[in-house]
């Protein structure tokens, strides 16, 4: 039974992997464009935030973004292979020492800043 599930997951990943998924990790600032359906119409909504965690689990791979808007912390969990996700773009590479940044949930303002990784920005330029 587990072999059937593995085969199914691999087939679905091949079908949905035509999108460009950049390499990123926790601490990076990402911009995600998602399709939003408002009744009859369809539009793109952009969410930009810091990646708090990334979970690599095949077809169920996901990551969580956090941003602060009007002094409110907003979190969004995004599945990598979801058909709703239109594009993922890395804005800034952050320098952190942890894989899961749960301590960031209680931080606001200057204390929530993440330093930029200079080694990754030089390679991209």
UniProtKB/Swiss-Prot annotation:
GO terms for cellular component: cytosolic large ribosomal subunit. GO terms for molecular function: structural constituent of ribosome. InterPro entries: Ribosomal_bL19, Ribosomal_bL19_sf, Translation_prot_SH3-like_sf. SUPFAM superfamilies: Translation proteins SH3-like domain (SSF50104). Gene3D superfamilies: 2.30.30.790. It comes from the Bacteria. GO terms for biological process: translation. This protein is located at the 30S-50S ribosomal subunit interface and may play a role in the structure and function of the aminoacyl-tRNA binding site. Belongs to the bacterial ribosomal protein bL19 family. This is Large ribosomal subunit protein bL19.
């Amino acid at each position: 039974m587990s072999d059937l599930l593995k085969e199914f997951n691999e087939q679905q990943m091949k079908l949905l992997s035509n999108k460009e998924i950049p390499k990123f990790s926790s601490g990076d600032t990402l911009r995600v464009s998602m399709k939003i359906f408002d009744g009859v119409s369809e539009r793109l909504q952009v969410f930009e935030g810091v990646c708090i965690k990334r979970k690599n689990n095949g077809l169920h791979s996901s990551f969580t973004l956090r941003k602060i808007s009007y002094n409110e912390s907003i979190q969004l969990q995004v599945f990598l292979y979801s058909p709703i996700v239109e594009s993922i773009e890395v804005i800034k590479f952050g320098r952190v020492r942890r894989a899961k940044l749960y301590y960031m949930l209680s931080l606001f303002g200057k204390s929530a800043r993440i330093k930029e990784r200079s080694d990754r920005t030089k390679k991209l330029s």
